Amino acid sequence: VAPPQHLCGSHLVDALYLVCGDRGFFYNPKGIVEQCCHRPCNIFDLQNYCN
């Protein structure tokens, strides 16, 4: 598992596409930016935003 990292902007969206794949994701900027851009997050945090 990759170490937690800061993901912001297009990097965050790209990571969501990678993690969620065909399931897609709901983009809630306030929640995910707080969790993954301001603080580092991991793949499990990202999976919480998949549909």
Swiss-Prot record:
The keyword Disulfide bond applies. Keywords: Carbohydrate metabolism, Disulfide bond, Glucose metabolism, Hormone, Secreted. One of its GO terms (molecular function) is hormone activity. GO terms for cellular component: extracellular space. Heterodimer of a B chain and an A chain linked by two disulfide bonds. SMART domains: IlGF. Disulfide bonds join C8-C37, C20-C50, C36-C41. SUPFAM superfamilies: Insulin-like. PROSITE patterns: INSULIN (PS00262). Belongs to the insulin family. It is found in: Secreted. Insulin decreases blood glucose concentration. It increases cell permeability to monosaccharides, amino acids and fatty acids. It accelerates glycolysis, the pentose phosphate cycle, and glycogen synthesis in liver. Gene3D superfamilies: Insulin-like (1.10.100.10). GO terms for biological process: glucose metabolic process. Signal peptide: none annotated. This is Insulin.
